[in-house]
Amino acid sequence: ELDLAFELAFAEDDEILIESFLDGMEVSVGVVDFEGETIVLGITEIVPTKEFFDYEAKYEGASEEITPARIDEATKVKVEEIAKRAYNSLGMSGFSRSEYIIMNGTPYMLEMNTNPGFSPASILPQQAKIYGISIKDLCGNEVEKALAKNKK
């Protein structure tokens, strides 16, 4: 199977990327700079009804999103620390939503989305609501930061 996969991949390009399959719980973590503090809004567990969390799963309800995620406190703390560290290390200042797979209590970062969805079905607004921050306040915070930056 691997030889055929290589053949198909190299038929498309002369470079390919091979990654290990991470079999674990998928979580999404919202992080924002709110009133001068880096805040983890929440950790949402993604329970797909399909094999992958694709467009249908994300926007057409083919997955269950559980906030807060069903993880132990030690894992929660690890995920929050990594999410904050990644956000700050990348010099982020607005909204972000990062994705992780948790295997045996170890979080593996998959990606960071710097332009997360803001529809009522989107994860970040749901996390903000649970955290106690309204969308109005979240967006107002961004406007205030932009105005302050332009005054400099």
Task: Name each region found by the language model.
Residues 1-81, 108:
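Phosphate-binding site of ATP-dependent enzymes
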Residues 72-152:
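ATP-dependent carboxylate activation and anion-phosphoryl transfer catalytic cores
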